[in-house]
Design a protein with these regions (language model features):
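Major-groove recognition helix of helix-turn-helix-like DNA-binding domains
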Residues: 42-44
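Basic nucleic-acid-binding interfaces
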Residues: 2-39, 48-87
Length: 87
């Protein structure tokens, strides 16, 4: 299992929302094909075919837990995680 798959699995499992590094969350969104634009410390992600806009901000080097949950819900809703979305 690759590092990306392990990271995606930990996000989808929902057991470590407080421990997800901001850079890791960004890497997952980039790998899933989201486009990023940055305004200050706001990282705004969009993707064709996905209605929602994802807006994330770092707290130190971590991602905010509620934003990790929002990303997880979008991945599950649109089945973006490949075979891993069935966690």
């Amino acid at each position: 299992m690759s590092q990306y798959e392990k990271l995606l699995l930990s996000i989808l499992s929902g057991t470590k929302d407080k421990g997800v590094l901001f850079a890791d969350l960004r890497a997952v969104l980039d790998r899933l094909g989201f486009q990023c634009r940055i305004k200050g410390d706001h990282f705004i992600y969009t993707k064709d075919g996905v209605e929602e806009i994802i807006n994330i901000q770092p707290v130190g080097n971590k991602a905010k837990p509620y934003q990790v949950k929002q990303v997880r819900n979008i991945i599950l809703k649109y089945q973006l995680g490949g075979d891993l979305h069935e966690v």
